[in-house]
Amino acid sequence: ENGTMEASIAAILHENGVFDVFPDEVLKQADAIPQQVDLASAGKRLDLRDKLIFTIDGDDAKDFDDAVSLEKLDNGHYLLGVHIADVSHYVTPDSPLDSEAFRRGTSVYFPGHVVPMLPFALSNGICSLNEGEDRLAFSCLMRLDENGEIRSYKFVKSVICSRVKGVYKEINALLEPPESETDADLTDLKTKYEAVLDQLPTMDELYRKRLVLRKARGGMDIESNEAKLVMDENGRCIDIVKRDRGTSECMIEEFMLLANQCAANAGRTNKAPFVYRVHEAPDAEKMEKLSATLLACGLNAKFKNPIPTQLELAALLDETRGQPIQIPVHTGILRSMQKARYA
């Protein structure tokens, strides 16, 4: 029916060549895959089901493709695990599922609606790291020293069982309880997260150490005014709010970056074919526009050279964080960056 949310989504999908319905042969292959893990056919795997592994996502997440775990050793070192759903065990090369996933390339998300890259039997079922269910995973197991530096890592095929379906805003409330939070509210949250409650401060501790290291090498945290649409039960937008990033969002982002860093290092060490995402230095014209933005905000930034270093830009970001001029300055720096390219 014209004018409805469903009609609008259907029109957008059609215009962009995205199909909401899977071919019969793809659905047939998906439906034939058991919804319980069969360890007998899963090959040699490291059994991590006794480890305190759990997912952390937004409260509207429906599929869970990554989970984390952390242990602190007696010598002050950390054992960090990032566990990714092992989709490749079920989607074999050149199969109907593989060909359709390749054709789609990605899942397409609308507020309250998703067109998955794989049928829901996989994306929300056997390939989703659902709470309390055994799942096959590909795990990056990292050892970090007392300062948060990576000392060693390994990649293994594993079988895991997520203990808790974590939610960002709930974990943020546990890590940094807001003044409005009552003891009863926190008691309920502590009950839900009882199995992993002791891990959360340790995760926060490691994240803070990683943050210090990232700042030292000029890592840039750019704040933006990302919006979130609030939908009612009928799929209609009833509000637009600022999407806030709390400690847990930043923490998980850092842990995923660590796993990516290990993967890139493994690829380089083994001289494996790899796709690199490259950010080149800003050009002079964009720097002139940035300087104009900074002057308009009352800042007279003194860079040593026409093209500032990453450390100089990172210092400018930190200097304006939390200030009234944060958004224009951070947005100006973001726009001064070259678009990423793949090589």
Predicted regions and their residues:
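Charge-lined substrate channels and their catalytic hotspots, especially those that engage the 3′ end
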Residues: 1-81, 88-134, 165, 172, ...
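Catalytic palm subdomain of template-directed nucleic-acid polymerases
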Residues: 71-74, 78, 83, 93-95, ...
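Append "with occasional cross-activation on large, charged helical scaffolds in nucleic-acid assemblies
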Residues: 155, 170-343
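Short loop/turn segments at secondary-structure transitions that flank enzyme active sites
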Residues: 2-3, 62, 87-88, 116, ...
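Structured core elements
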Residues: 53-55, 67-69, 79-83, 89, ...
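Short, well-ordered loop/turn elements at secondary-structure boundaries
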Residues: 49-50, 63-64, 73-78, 104, ...
